Design a protein with these regions (language model features):
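Long, charged N-terminal accessory/stalk domains
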Residues: 123-124, 130-179, 183-186
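Conserved NTPase motor "head" modules and their coupling/switch loops across ABC/AAA+ ATPases, GTPases
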Residues: 1-31, 172-313, 322-326, 330-333, ...
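Walker B catalytic acidic pair
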Residues: 317-319
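Conserved lysine of the Walker
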Residues: 36
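Post-Walker A helix-loop "phosphate-sensing" segment adjacent to the P-loop in P-loop NTPases
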Residues: 45-57, 299-307
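Structural recognition of the conserved hydrophobic beta-strand(s) that form the central parallel beta-sheet
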Residues: 72, 339-346
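Nucleotide-state sensing region of NTPase/ATPase domains
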Residues: 48-125, 129-131, 137-143, 147, ...
């Protein structure tokens, strides 16, 4: 999977820019706040219809513009594709794949995949469960269209149920709607558990190897998927998962109505990460957490490659500058085989070390 060219109009600080990329290594350097991360953000957005940092599409439209356009030429699966997204301030976005209108972002995810790694990801191990769920969701939504659809529906049901519980004090009759919402949530929740368990097992397999190699064989990383307590075996058949999720939700009905909050379901899932048997979130050093985060991201890349037969586009946003020389070398020795984009600062030696095509970004212009 490779990005051949990218065109941006009124996206962030890019008023109008067209650029062609190297099929292997692209190094983007420049001072801070010039547009390096914005460029990577556009590549990620065109792969999945979601920004790794913006909460709304409007945030990505240039301040003085009514709309923004992102368009890319892509090579994947021995074919060439053209994807286009138009973002608007006052209406829904529009998307196309090869000039055919796309109903939703799932159409973008079927063209190419990205693995985005930024400095915040180095703290993935120590953050709360929401960060690790987001990590799973981002990967699985690109890989599995059924997962993306189930997640969107689960979130919709969760939001509705939350409003019902919140408003039930003034309108107790709303509680009559809960059984239907609960039943649909457990059915879509079972789909989430099924795919998350598969992803966590693959992640554990690959990340453990990367972590062992980076630590010189001194440490053992283990990743375990954690869902609601009533699910005794996340690998069970769908109907079994549904029944166990249903039992958990029924046992929490009283507490949910009392607290007016959704307390049961896979929206509380987590990845439990241990190093030598000790939970990394609480006991690992800064160096250990960074090594573990690197292992997770490299494992994510391998999962994509095994699922699709091609490496995803790898985007390293100012990550290498945050690492010591040993970890820098470890990453650079493991990114061959696919297209990579690496951002760095003006005074960084990475452009000289990496080769490939070098781009200088200044005030939203790429030279």
């Amino acid at each position: 999977m490779r990005i051949l060219e990218l065109e941006l109009q009124h996206f962030r600080n890019y008023s109008g820019q067209r650029v062609s990329f190297d099929p292997d290594c692209n190094v983007i350097f420049g001072e801070n706040a010039q547009g390096k991360t914005n460029l990577l953000e556009a590549i990620v957005y065109l792969s999945c219809g979601k920004s790794p940092r913006a909460r709304t599409d409007r945030e990505m439209i240039a301040f003085d513009a009514p709309a923004a356009v992102l368009e890319a030429g892509i090579s994947a699966r021995d074919r060439e594709f053209r994807t286009r997204v138009e973002l608007y301030r006052d209406r829904r976005r529009k998307m196309w794949v090869n000039q055919v209108p796309a109903k939703n972002s799932a159409a973008l995810s079927q063209v190419y995949h990205t693995v985005f790694f930024c400095p915040d990801d180095l703290y993935l191990i120590r953050e709360g469960a929401a960060a690790r769920r987001r990590f799973m969701d981002t990967a699985l939504c690109q890989l599995r269209p059924r997962y993306a659809a189930a997640l969107a529906e689960y979130h919709r049901l969760y939001d509705h149920k939350t409003r019902i519980l919140r408003d039930s004090e003034e309108r107790p009759d709303l509680l009559e709607l809960l059984p239907d919402f609960n039943e649909r949530m457990v059915r879509f929740g079972a789909v989430l558990v099924h795919y998350r368990r598969q992803f966590a097992e693959a992640l554990n397999r690959y990340a453990a190897r990367h972590h062992r190699e980076c630590s010189g064989g001194r440490e053992r990383l283990e990743i375990t998927y954690q869902t609601v307590s009533s699910v005794t075996d996340p690998a069970a058949e769908g109907e079994v998962l549904t029944e166990q999720l249903r039992a958990h939700m029924e046992s929490h009905q009283g507490a949910e109505r009392a607290s007016r909050m959704c307390l049961s379901g896979p929206h509380k899932d987590d990845l439990v990460i241990t190093i030598d048997g000790r939970e990394a979130k609480s006991y690992s050093s800064q160096g250990q957490t960074r090594t573990a985060a690197l292992a997770l991201k490299l494992a994510e890349r391998e999962i994509y490659q095994n699922a699709t037969g091609e490496y995803p586009v790898l985007l390293l946003d100012d990550v290498l500058s945050e690492l010591d020389p040993r970890r820098q070398e470890f990453v650079l020795n493991r990114i061959a085989g696919g297209q990579v984009f690496i951002t760095c600062c003006e005074d960084d030696r990475l452009p000289v070390l990496l080769g490939g095509k070098v781009f200088h970004v200044k005030q939203g212009a790429i030279g």
